[in-house]
């Protein structure tokens, strides 16, 4: 990467964390925030900032080019429903999507990346900015009933890995060795709320990356807000794939989980 970088910011604190890491490296950072998703305050932290919608790829590319930027990274959650709905309202994107084998999240995002590439903006691997945030392996917050959590995890772990590899979702919720909820377009937090409404307290939430995860595309992540959702749902545990799913605001999340009786576990 050169001395200038574009950041495409989706939902969650990942965008803010990555912007901070990039600026520590001395990069000029122009941020394009996804309207209705990117966290507030990025305008004050970026060297240049503009809002955009999922269909505004030409405007996004022009914004970056106007600041001398030819390379960008994409961070934060870009919900499938936004891409599937609003982005396909752009005729050029709709024509591109019509030629795709499916409209799964990774397929659509790769198509949008190719579209930006043709417009002169290369979307790069963001891994260099994520090193401080990897989820460690082991128990971060102990479970009240560790044997029960391990039983649920042993049941659900191969399922969530398969779910991720099938590009359906990256979150699975289980209880009593049964699948309660599978993440679809709604995202992790809404999946957890739905599971709690269906099965009550004590669910175990599992989150994993795809086996062949393209780090540019829909990288799974967890943070304080996700843990707060689990506490509200009175979940038993959150099990995250260690080393492959970034965990932001980890110390604050550990404190919230411990206070709320939710175990946090990193698993490979």
Task: List PLM regions with ranges.
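Conserved alpha/beta cores of soluble small-molecule-handling proteins
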Residues: 27-28, 32-34, 52-86, 110, ...
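Short coil/turn connectors at secondary-structure junctions
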Residues: 1-4, 25-28, 46, 67-70, ...
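Feature captures the catalytic cores and cofactor-binding loops of soluble hydro-lyases/lyases
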Residues: 34-67, 86-95, 189-268
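N-terminal basic/disordered segments at the start of proteins
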Residues: 1-34
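Short glycine-rich anion-binding loops that position phosphate/pyrophosphate groups of nucleotides
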Residues: 11, 77-80, 178, 210-211
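Conserved mixed alpha/beta catalytic, RNA-binding, or beta-rich assembly cores of soluble enzyme
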Residues: 22, 36, 123-227
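General beta-strand structural signal in soluble alpha/beta enzymes
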Residues: 7-9, 31-32, 72-75, 105, ...
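Hydrophobic alpha-helical segments and helix pairs
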Residues: 88-143
């Amino acid at each position: 990467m050169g001395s200038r970088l574009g950041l495409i910011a989706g939902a969650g604190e990942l965008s803010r964390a990555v912007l901070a890491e990039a600026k520590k490296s001395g990069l000029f950072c122009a941020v394009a925030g996804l309207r209705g998703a990117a966290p507030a305050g990025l305008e004050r932290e970026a060297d240049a900032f503009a809002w955009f919608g999922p269909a505004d790829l030409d405007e996004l590319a022009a914004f970056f080019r106007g600041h001398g930027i030819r390379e960008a990274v994409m961070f934060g959650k870009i919900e499938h429903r936004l891409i599937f709905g609003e982005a396909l309202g752009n005729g050029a994107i709709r024509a591109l999507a019509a030629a795709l084998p499916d409209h799964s999240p990774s397929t659509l995002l790769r198509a949008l990346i190719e579209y930006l590439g043709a417009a002169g903006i290369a979307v790069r691997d963001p891994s260099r900015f994520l090193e401080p945030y990897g989820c460690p392996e082991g128990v971060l917050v102990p479970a009240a009933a560790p044997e029960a959590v391990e039983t649920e995890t042993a049941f659900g772990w191969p399922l969530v890995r398969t779910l991720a590899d099938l590009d359906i979702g990256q979150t699975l919720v289980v209880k009593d060795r049964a699948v309660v909820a599978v993440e679809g377009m709604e995202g992790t937090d809404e999946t957890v709320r739905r599971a709690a409404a269906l099965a009550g307290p004590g669910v175990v939430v599992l989150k994993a990356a795809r086996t062949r995860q393209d780090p540019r595309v829909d990288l799974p992540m967890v943070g304080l807000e996700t843990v707060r959702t689990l506490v509200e749902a009175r979940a038993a545990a959150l099990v995250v794939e260690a080393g492959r799913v970034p965990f932001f605001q980890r110390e604050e999340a550990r404190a919230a989980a411990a206070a709320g009786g939710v175990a946090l576990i990193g698993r490979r």
